[in-house]
C-alpha cells in the first residue's frame, strides 16, 4: 500500500466512526485531492499533533506572526502560512482544493488546529499592497528604478486603483464560521471555536499585545519579531516620500469609513480617532477607475509584466527543521525571551554554515588543548644511572 493509499484508508476508517464528519471527506475524488494537497504541503510527514494555519489576506502583519511562531513553536507545531488558493497554486501546484478544505481535513485527522487572521486599518493596508508590487506589476519596472520615480504620478495611479485593492477579510468573508456580534475590545482578539477548530482574529494595531495574547491562547511563551517592512526594501525612498506626501481625496476617505470590516474591528472611539487622523490629510475628491476600467488596467498590467515576483525569502525564520536550523532557532528564542534582539535570519544555508564553523572552532580548541597539555617526561637512562652511581660513592 503506497503512502497516498494508506492516508486514504486511514481517512475512510475514521469516516465510519464519524457520521457527522465534514461532507467533502465522504467523496473519494475530493478526498484524494485533499490528501494530495496535504502531501504537497509536506504535512503527511509531520509527527506533531498541533497545526497552526496563519490564513490571512496579504499585508496585514501575518509574516511577523509566522516567523515568531516558527521560532517558538516549531518543535511542537506545524506552521502553515497561506493567503489564498492562489498561494496554494503558486507554491505547491494545488489547484482543486480550497484552503478551508485543507484546514478541515487536518481536524478530521484528529489534529489540534488553530487558524489565525489579522485585520489592518484599510488605508494603510491599501498603501502597503500597492507598494508590494509597484515595480513588476503597476509600473512594469524593477523596484530600484521605480524608487526614483516622481511621486505625483505614483499617487495618481494609487488613487485610481484605491477602491479595488485591500478590501478582503478572511475571518468575516472566507472562514465560513459564526461571527460574534462584536469584536472583543477588552481582550483585543476574537476566538471562535467551530468544528473543533480554534479561529483567532487579531488586529495589527494591537501588535504590542500579540505576545501576551498568543502566549495565552497557544499555551507557550512567544515573543513577536518584526518582519518584512517596506522600509527595508528597494522602494523604501519612494515609500517614505509617499507616506509623507500623500493626501487622501475626501470621497475615498468617506467611502473607507463605511467599510464593514473597519466598523466591526474598530470601536466608535477608534473609528473617530482614525477619521480625525486622516481628515487632517484630506484633499479634493477625485474620479477613480470604474469597474470596467480597473478590469482593463489589471489585464494590461498582467500582459505587460515580464518580471517574476514571488516572495520566498521574506521570513525572519524560513521554517526549516533540520538540526542546524533547530540549534540556531533555540539560540534565537533564548535571546528573545531574555529581552535581547537578533539581527539575522534563520535560513538553512546560513544555519548550516554557522554550525560547521562552530564545530570547526570547537575541534580546533580541543586539538589546541591537547597539544598544550604537559605529558609525563620520559626517563633519561644515562642521567638516572649517573645519579645512582653518585649516591653510591
State the predicted function of each range.
Residues 2-269, 274-283, 297, 372-373, ...:
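PAPS-dependent sulfotransferase catalytic domain
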Residues 3, 16-18, 152, 233, ...:
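Generic detection of intrinsically disordered/low-complexity segments and helix-coil linkers/edges
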Residues 1-50, 296-393:
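Juxtamembrane luminal stem/stalk of type II transmembrane Golgi/ER carbohydrate-processing enzymes
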Residues 83-87, 133-142, 289-292, 298-302, ...:
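A short, terminal or domain-edge coil/loop segment
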Amino acid at each position: 500500500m503506497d503512502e497516498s493509499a494508506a492516508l486514504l484508508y486511514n481517512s475512510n476508517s475514521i469516516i465510519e466512526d464519524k457520521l457527522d464528519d465534514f461532507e467533502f471527506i465522504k467523496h473519494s475524488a475530493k478526498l484524494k485531492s485533499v490528501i494530495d494537497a496535504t502531501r504537497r504541503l509536506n504535512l503527511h510527514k509531520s509527527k506533531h499533533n498541533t497545526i497552526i494555519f496563519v490564513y490571512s489576506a496579504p499585508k496585514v502583519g501575518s509574516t511577523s506572526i509566522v516567523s515568531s511562531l516558527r521560532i517558538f513553536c516549531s518543535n511542537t507545531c506545524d506552521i502553515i502560512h497561506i493567503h489564498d488558493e492562489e498561494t496554494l497554486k503558486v507554491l505547491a501546484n494545488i489547484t482543486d482544493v480550497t484552503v478551508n478544505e485543507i484546514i478541515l481535513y487536518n481536524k478530521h485527522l484528529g489534529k489540534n488546529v488553530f487558524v489565525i487572521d489579522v485585520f489592518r486599518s484599510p488605508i494603510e493596508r491599501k498603501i502597503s499592497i500597492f507598494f508590494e508590487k509597484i515595480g513588476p506589476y503597476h509600473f512594469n519596472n524593477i523596484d530600484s528604478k521605480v524608487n526614483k520615480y516622481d511621486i505625483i504620478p505614483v499617487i495618481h495611479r494609487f488613487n485610481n486603483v484605491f477602491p479595488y485593492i485591500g478590501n478582503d477579510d478572511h475571518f468575516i468573508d472566507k472562514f465560513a464560521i459564526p461571527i460574534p456580534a462584536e469584536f472583543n475590545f477588552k481582550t483585543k482578539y476574537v476566538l471562535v471555536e467551530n468544528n473543533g477548530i480554534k479561529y483567532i482574529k487579531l488586529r495589527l494595531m494591537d501588535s504590542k499585545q500579540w505576545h501576551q495574547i498568543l502566549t495565552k491562547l497557544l499555551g507557550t511563551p512567544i515573543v513577536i519579531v518584526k518582519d518584512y517592512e517596506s522600509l527595508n526594501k528597494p522602494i523604501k525612498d519612494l515609500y517614505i516620500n509617499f507616506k509623507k506626501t500623500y493626501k487622501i481625496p475626501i470621497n475615498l476617505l468617506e467611502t473607507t469609513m463605511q467599510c464593514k470590516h473597519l466598523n466591526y474591528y474598530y470601536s466608535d472611539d477608534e473609528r473617530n480617532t482614525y477619521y480625525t487622523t486622516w481628515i487632517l490629510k484630506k484633499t479634493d475628491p477625485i474620479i477613480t477607475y470604474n469597474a470596467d476600467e480597473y478590469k482593463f488596467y489589471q489585464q494590461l498590467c498582467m500582459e505587460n509584466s515580464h518580471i517574476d515576483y514571488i516572495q520566498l525569502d521574506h521570513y525572519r525564520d524560513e521554517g526549516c527543521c533540520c538540526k542546524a536550523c533547530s540549534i540556531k532557532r533555540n539560540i534565537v528564542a533564548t535571546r528573545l525571551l531574555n529581552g535581547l534582539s537578533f539581527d539575522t535570519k534563520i535560513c538553512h544555508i546560513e544555519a548550516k554554515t554557522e554550525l560547521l564553523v562552530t564545530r570547526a572552532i570547537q575541534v580546533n580548541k580541543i586539538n589546541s588543548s591537547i597539544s598544550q597539555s604537559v605529558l609525563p617526561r620520559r626517563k633519561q637512562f644515562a642521567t638516572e644511572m649517573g645519579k645512582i652511581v653518585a649516591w653510591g660513592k
